[in-house]
């Protein structure tokens, strides 16, 4: 019975995470591969409007041997699977910065995605979070 409860909880968490990611994607690009655009003085690219330092922080998923970081970043950002992997990696790298805030996983993911490693502490990310929350109802 305990194993069954853990399995059901894991499935529920996976769905909540997928809903949260989808809503972040919708907020950033309508969940479309929109290429790169200037945003606050630097390029943001793809489904999640990822900037190059964010791509570096998420571990540069999908980067091929001998490929420049810039080429890999732009390609990854316009590939939904790769870009989603980057956002998940970024969340996992920086979620500890938000321990003790009482924020749920989706709020931490959304606010850090929008505001950087300590975005969960920045009041400027609240509007972004409210938009994501209204999409999925996630916490």
Curated annotation (Swiss-Prot):
Its EC number is 3.2.1.17. The keyword Hydrolase applies. Transmembrane segments: none annotated. One of its GO terms (molecular function) is lysozyme activity. CDD domains: lyz_i. Substrate binds at residues 51-57, 90, 113-115. The active site is at residues 28, 39. This is Invertebrate-type lysozyme 2.
């Amino acid at each position: 019975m305990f194993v069954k409860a853990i399995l059901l909880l894991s499935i529920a968490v996976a769905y909540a995470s997928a809903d949260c990611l989808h809503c972040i994607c919708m907020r950033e690009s309508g969940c479309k591969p929109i290429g790169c655009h200037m945003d606050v003085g630097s390029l943001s690219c793809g489904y999640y409007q990822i900037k190059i330092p964010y791509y570096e922080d998420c571990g540069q998923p999908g980067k091929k041997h001998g490929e420049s970081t810039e080429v890999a970043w732009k390609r990854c950002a316009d590939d939904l699977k790769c870009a989603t992997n980057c956002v998940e990696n970024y969340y996992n790298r920086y979620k500890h910065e938000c321990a003790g805030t009482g924020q749920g996983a989706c709020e931490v993911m959304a606010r850090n995605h929008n505001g950087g490693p300590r975005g969960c502490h920045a009041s400027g990310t609240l509007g972004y979070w409210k938009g994501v929350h209204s999409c999925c109802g996630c916490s």
